[in-house]
Protein backbone atom coordinates (compact mmCIF):
# COMPACT_ATOMS: atom_id res chain seq x y z
CA UNK A 1 0.00 0.00 0.00
CA UNK A 2 1.42 3.41 -1.00
CA UNK A 3 1.53 6.40 1.35
CA UNK A 4 -1.33 7.96 -0.63
CA UNK A 5 -3.51 5.00 0.27
CA UNK A 6 -3.34 5.59 4.00
CA UNK A 7 -6.67 4.90 5.64
CA UNK A 8 -7.92 7.18 8.40
CA UNK A 9 -10.62 6.85 11.04
CA UNK A 10 -14.02 8.15 10.00
CA UNK A 11 -16.91 8.63 12.42
CA UNK A 12 -20.14 7.80 10.63
CA UNK A 13 -23.27 9.69 11.75
CA UNK A 14 -25.15 6.41 12.21
CA UNK A 15 -22.69 5.55 15.02
CA UNK A 16 -22.84 2.10 13.33
CA UNK A 17 -26.00 1.40 15.35
CA UNK A 18 -27.88 -0.12 12.39
CA UNK A 19 -25.03 -2.53 11.58
CA UNK A 20 -24.75 -5.94 13.20
CA UNK A 21 -21.22 -6.79 14.30
CA UNK A 22 -19.68 -3.54 13.05
CA UNK A 23 -17.64 -1.44 15.48
CA UNK A 24 -17.29 2.33 14.90
CA UNK A 25 -13.58 2.21 15.69
CA UNK A 26 -13.02 -0.31 12.88
CA UNK A 27 -14.30 2.01 10.12
CA UNK A 28 -11.54 3.67 8.11
CA UNK A 29 -11.46 5.45 4.77
CA UNK A 30 -8.96 7.00 2.39
CA UNK A 31 -9.00 10.02 0.14
CA UNK A 32 -9.64 9.60 -3.58
CA UNK A 33 -6.76 8.59 -5.82
CA UNK A 34 -6.20 9.29 -9.50
CA UNK A 35 -7.68 5.93 -10.42
CA UNK A 36 -10.88 6.86 -8.60
CA UNK A 37 -11.30 9.91 -10.82
CA UNK A 38 -11.59 7.60 -13.82
CA UNK A 39 -14.80 6.19 -12.37
CA UNK A 40 -15.99 9.39 -10.71
CA UNK A 41 -15.96 11.09 -14.11
CA UNK A 42 -18.41 8.48 -15.39
CA UNK A 43 -21.00 9.10 -12.67
CA UNK A 44 -24.30 10.66 -13.67
CA UNK A 45 -27.49 11.16 -11.63
CA UNK A 46 -28.86 8.02 -13.29
CA UNK A 47 -25.96 5.69 -12.42
CA UNK A 48 -24.74 7.29 -9.19
CA UNK A 49 -25.81 4.49 -6.86
CA UNK A 50 -24.05 1.69 -8.74
CA UNK A 51 -20.96 3.64 -9.84
CA UNK A 52 -20.30 5.30 -6.51
CA UNK A 53 -20.70 1.98 -4.74
CA UNK A 54 -17.71 0.70 -6.70
CA UNK A 55 -15.68 3.67 -5.48
CA UNK A 56 -16.74 3.06 -1.90
CA UNK A 57 -15.70 -0.58 -2.02
CA UNK A 58 -12.10 0.52 -2.50
CA UNK A 59 -12.16 3.62 -0.33
CA UNK A 60 -13.76 2.47 2.92
CA UNK A 61 -12.95 -0.47 5.19
CA UNK A 62 -14.56 -2.15 8.16
CA UNK A 63 -18.04 -2.36 6.64
CA UNK A 64 -19.74 -3.64 3.51
CA UNK A 65 -20.68 -0.42 1.65
CA UNK A 66 -23.86 -2.03 0.30
CA UNK A 67 -25.18 -2.26 3.86
CA UNK A 68 -24.44 1.37 4.74
CA UNK A 69 -27.35 3.71 5.30
CA UNK A 70 -28.09 6.52 2.87
CA UNK A 71 -27.23 9.07 5.56
CA UNK A 72 -23.80 7.55 6.07
CA UNK A 73 -23.23 7.63 2.31
CA UNK A 74 -24.15 11.31 2.14
CA UNK A 75 -21.69 12.03 4.94
CA UNK A 76 -19.00 9.96 3.21
CA UNK A 77 -19.48 11.92 -0.03
CA UNK A 78 -18.91 15.20 1.81
CA UNK A 79 -15.99 13.74 3.78
CA UNK A 80 -14.31 12.75 0.53
CA UNK A 81 -14.96 16.13 -1.09
CA UNK A 82 -13.35 17.93 1.85
CA UNK A 83 -10.30 15.66 1.97
CA UNK A 84 -9.81 15.19 -1.76
CA UNK A 85 -10.88 18.48 -3.33
CA UNK A 86 -11.80 21.46 -1.16
CA UNK A 87 -13.00 22.26 2.34
CA UNK A 88 -14.81 25.36 1.07
CA UNK A 89 -17.76 25.77 -1.26
CA UNK A 90 -18.47 29.04 -3.04
CA UNK A 91 -21.77 29.96 -4.63
CA UNK A 92 -23.89 32.97 -5.51
CA UNK A 93 -27.18 34.05 -4.00
CA UNK A 94 -29.33 37.13 -3.50
CA UNK A 95 -29.22 38.74 -0.06
CA UNK A 96 -32.79 39.03 1.21
CA UNK A 97 -31.89 42.17 3.18
CA UNK A 98 -30.26 44.36 0.51
CA UNK A 99 -31.34 42.51 -2.63
CA UNK A 100 -27.78 42.39 -4.00
CA UNK A 101 -26.27 39.42 -5.82
CA UNK A 102 -23.43 38.18 -3.63
CA UNK A 103 -20.93 35.35 -3.54
CA UNK A 104 -20.26 33.57 -0.27
CA UNK A 105 -17.82 30.92 0.86
CA UNK A 106 -18.95 28.17 3.22
CA UNK A 107 -16.41 26.23 5.28
CA UNK A 108 -17.74 22.69 4.91
CA UNK A 109 -15.73 21.56 7.93
CA UNK A 110 -17.91 23.76 10.15
CA UNK A 111 -21.17 22.12 9.13
CA UNK A 112 -22.80 20.22 11.96
CA UNK A 113 -23.39 16.49 11.71
CA UNK A 114 -26.71 14.96 12.72
CA UNK A 115 -26.18 11.59 14.40
CA UNK A 116 -28.60 8.82 15.23
CA UNK A 117 -29.62 8.93 18.90
CA UNK A 118 -27.52 6.68 21.11
CA UNK A 119 -30.55 4.54 22.00
CA UNK A 120 -31.49 3.84 18.38
CA UNK A 121 -31.99 0.15 17.71
CA UNK A 122 -33.21 -1.89 14.76
CA UNK A 123 -35.80 -3.11 14.14
CA UNK A 124 -37.62 -0.04 15.42
CA UNK A 125 -41.24 -0.52 16.46
CA UNK A 126 -43.75 2.24 15.75
CA UNK A 127 -47.56 2.33 16.04
CA UNK A 128 -49.35 3.24 12.82
CA UNK A 129 -52.44 5.48 12.81
CA UNK A 130 -54.61 2.47 11.98
CA UNK A 131 -53.64 0.88 15.29
CA UNK A 132 -51.19 -1.79 14.14
CA UNK A 133 -47.52 -1.88 15.10
CA UNK A 134 -44.81 -2.24 12.51
CA UNK A 135 -41.10 -3.06 12.79
CA UNK A 136 -38.89 -0.87 10.62
CA UNK A 137 -35.26 -0.47 9.65
CA UNK A 138 -33.33 2.24 7.84
CA UNK A 139 -32.80 1.90 4.11
CA UNK A 140 -29.37 0.93 2.80
CA UNK A 141 -27.43 1.64 -0.36
CA UNK A 142 -28.42 -1.83 -1.60
CA UNK A 143 -32.08 -0.96 -0.99
CA UNK A 144 -31.71 2.25 -2.99
CA UNK A 145 -30.03 0.44 -5.88
CA UNK A 146 -32.80 -2.16 -5.96
CA UNK A 147 -35.48 0.54 -5.70
CA UNK A 148 -34.04 2.45 -8.64
CA UNK A 149 -33.89 -0.71 -10.72
CA UNK A 150 -37.49 -1.47 -9.75
CA UNK A 151 -38.50 2.06 -10.77
CA UNK A 152 -37.34 1.33 -14.32
CA UNK A 153 -40.18 -1.14 -14.75
CA UNK A 154 -42.83 0.04 -12.29
CA UNK A 155 -44.36 3.22 -10.90
CA UNK A 156 -44.54 1.71 -7.41
CA UNK A 157 -41.00 2.55 -6.28
CA UNK A 158 -42.33 4.51 -3.30
CA UNK A 159 -44.19 1.47 -1.98
CA UNK A 160 -41.15 -0.69 -2.78
CA UNK A 161 -38.91 1.48 -0.59
CA UNK A 162 -41.40 1.40 2.26
CA UNK A 163 -41.74 -2.37 1.96
CA UNK A 164 -37.96 -2.84 2.07
CA UNK A 165 -37.86 -1.03 5.38
CA UNK A 166 -40.52 -3.27 6.95
CA UNK A 167 -38.99 -6.08 9.03
CA UNK A 168 -41.38 -9.01 8.91
CA UNK A 169 -41.69 -12.42 7.30
CA UNK A 170 -42.82 -12.60 3.70
CA UNK A 171 -41.64 -11.65 0.25
CA UNK A 172 -41.22 -8.09 -0.96
CA UNK A 173 -44.30 -8.61 -3.14
CA UNK A 174 -46.38 -9.65 -0.13
CA UNK A 175 -45.20 -6.64 1.85
CA UNK A 176 -46.01 -4.27 -1.00
CA UNK A 177 -49.50 -5.66 -1.40
CA UNK A 178 -50.12 -5.28 2.32
CA UNK A 179 -48.90 -1.69 2.30
CA UNK A 180 -51.07 -0.82 -0.69
CA UNK A 181 -54.14 -1.91 1.27
CA UNK A 182 -53.31 0.19 4.34
CA UNK A 183 -54.57 3.76 4.86
CA UNK A 184 -52.38 6.44 3.29
CA UNK A 185 -51.64 7.77 6.78
CA UNK A 186 -49.97 4.45 7.67
CA UNK A 187 -47.68 4.59 4.64
CA UNK A 188 -46.94 8.25 5.33
CA UNK A 189 -45.94 7.32 8.88
CA UNK A 190 -43.45 4.78 7.53
CA UNK A 191 -42.01 7.46 5.27
CA UNK A 192 -41.86 9.84 8.23
CA UNK A 193 -39.77 7.28 10.13
CA UNK A 194 -36.94 7.79 7.63
CA UNK A 195 -37.25 11.57 7.79
CA UNK A 196 -37.27 11.51 11.59
CA UNK A 197 -34.10 9.46 11.76
CA UNK A 198 -32.20 11.41 9.15
CA UNK A 199 -28.51 11.34 9.94
CA UNK A 200 -25.72 12.96 7.99
CA UNK A 201 -24.40 16.45 7.34
CA UNK A 202 -26.62 19.31 8.46
CA UNK A 203 -26.43 21.61 5.46
CA UNK A 204 -28.00 24.56 7.31
CA UNK A 205 -25.55 27.30 8.24
CA UNK A 206 -25.29 31.07 8.68
CA UNK A 207 -23.69 33.64 6.42
CA UNK A 208 -22.92 37.35 6.56
CA UNK A 209 -23.66 39.50 3.52
CA UNK A 210 -20.43 41.20 2.33
CA UNK A 211 -22.50 44.11 0.97
CA UNK A 212 -24.74 45.13 3.88
CA UNK A 213 -23.44 43.02 6.77
CA UNK A 214 -26.78 41.35 7.44
CA UNK A 215 -26.68 37.80 8.78
CA UNK A 216 -29.05 35.12 7.61
CA UNK A 217 -29.54 31.36 7.51
CA UNK A 218 -29.00 29.32 4.39
CA UNK A 219 -29.21 25.68 3.39
CA UNK A 220 -26.06 24.75 1.50
CA UNK A 221 -27.16 22.87 -1.63
CA UNK A 222 -25.95 19.27 -1.71
CA UNK A 223 -24.68 19.52 -5.26
CA UNK A 224 -23.62 16.88 -7.73
CA UNK A 225 -20.18 18.52 -7.76
CA UNK A 226 -19.58 16.96 -4.35
CA UNK A 227 -19.12 13.71 -6.29
CA UNK A 228 -16.80 15.03 -8.99
CA UNK A 229 -16.07 18.76 -9.33
CA UNK A 230 -15.81 20.10 -12.85
CA UNK A 231 -16.26 23.41 -14.65
CA UNK A 232 -16.69 26.38 -12.31
CA UNK A 233 -16.51 24.19 -9.20
CA UNK A 234 -13.16 22.80 -10.33
CA UNK A 235 -11.81 26.25 -11.15
CA UNK A 236 -12.84 27.59 -7.76
CA UNK A 237 -11.12 24.72 -5.98
CA UNK A 238 -7.87 24.55 -7.94
CA UNK A 239 -7.68 27.52 -10.34
CA UNK A 240 -5.52 29.61 -8.00
CA UNK A 241 -2.81 26.97 -8.13
CA UNK A 242 -2.32 27.56 -11.85
CA UNK A 243 -0.09 30.51 -12.66
CA UNK A 244 -0.93 32.67 -15.70
What name fits each language-model region?
Residues 1-244:
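Long C-terminal interaction/binding lobes of large macromolecular proteins
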Amino acid sequence: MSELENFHAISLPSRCLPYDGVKPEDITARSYLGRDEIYLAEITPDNLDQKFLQIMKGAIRGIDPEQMTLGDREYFILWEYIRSYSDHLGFELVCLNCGKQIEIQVDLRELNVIELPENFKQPYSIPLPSGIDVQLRLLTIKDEIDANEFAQKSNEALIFRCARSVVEAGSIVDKMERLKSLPASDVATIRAFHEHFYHGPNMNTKFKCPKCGAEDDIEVPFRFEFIFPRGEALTRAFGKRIRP
